[in-house]
Amino acid sequence: MAKCKRNRNRAKRNFTVKTPTANRNYKDTVFRMLFSDRKNLLSLYNAVNQSDYKNPEELEIVTLENAIYMGMKNDLAFIMDTNLYLYEHQSTYNPNMPLRDLFYICSEYQKLVDKKSLYSSTLQKIPAPNFIEFYNGSTAIADCTELRLSSAFEHLSGEPKLELIVTVLNVNEGHNAELMQHCSMLKEYAQLDEFTIFLYTCICRVILINLLLETCFRLAGKRI
């Protein structure tokens, strides 16, 4: 898998507060549908982590397509080897994913941890989080990049005291060949998306040509 590049662009000052809405793009829906299947999800996990697990029942699903937190619909969240993995699909480039995932992981930890145990002298163990974004938008990015929560901090001095890293994997056709090779379903999804874009482009061109011809005929009729 390609070496990740860090994205440390500082967010511009913006005090406008908007309520986030759940993304209902067809690409996201197809991704959730395909990888809500345990067998497909395990194949994707093995491809990303270069592992070879065989039993899909080892996946403990935390949330699936109906999980919405602050208007954010995540795609797939599950526990494997006591680690919590959050897999999300994005069809548009979004530098705010680390902040969104911070909201989400805090919500999940609240569900997993007994609040009373936080006041005891015993250390409360929690699953280590892992954040993966599968990106297939039109904005060109490398095969593997990183988005960091600290990029959003204003007037940051020294090392950040809080950090969250989202690994972004480009799953457009022609990217991450090794990853695609080890997960046939992901490869087929990328091919389907490429074909859908091609088909949509062709349909738009046909509609445009028909409109142009119709306009020409109307103009010609007026001149006769």
What are these regions (language model features)?
Residues 2-224:
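Elongated, amphipathic alpha-helical interaction scaffolds
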